[in-house]
Amino acid sequence: MTLRLGDVAPDFEQDSSIGPLKFHEWAGNSWVVLFSHPADFTPVCTTELGLTAKLKPEFDKRNVKAIALSVDPAEKHAAWISDIEQTQDTVVGFPIIADEDRSVSSLYDMIHPNASTTATVRTLFVIDPAKKVRLSLTYPMSTGRNFDEVLRVIDALQLTDGYTVATPGNWKDGDDVIIPLTVQDPEVLKQKYPKGFTAARPYLRVTPQPNK
């Protein structure tokens, strides 16, 4: 099935590197980064999971849980985790789903037949505590993901969930933000944006990040 932004991320139960896992129950009230990789014991995937492991403190600060997926069995995941930890100098503190029957891969449309009929492509979903899909990214098998960008988008989503703002191109935490066009009333502008704003055009109003 095709998952669109705002859709509820489907629940599932599947084996994993930490045993049988019920997805929604495991996710709890956290944000989730769910990402698939083509296969265990492959070079690009090893670097990606190593990076994810090293970013655990950053994920923790944002109330984010990471979970990976491939169609390899749990026993193979366990052996590969040892390799990841040795070669990437880290500890893998997140589960890897063992989707041998490809049920989760199909549910999340992670197998693209024109890329591979059996292996999952590099799909990534950011899912919020309400289990809604907030970001969907798909990378080709030859290209590793940019996890700094994943963190940047999570920062933007969490900021815009809490404040009536939008983030401009290349925004990063601490930069100025945009006032949405839906806010026009002068009194509301004063109330919501006490730091003031500058307007390059009536539709382009910039204000300091409200929680900084």
Where do the protein language model's features map onto the residues?
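Chalcogenol-based redox active-site neighborhoods
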Residues: M1-K212
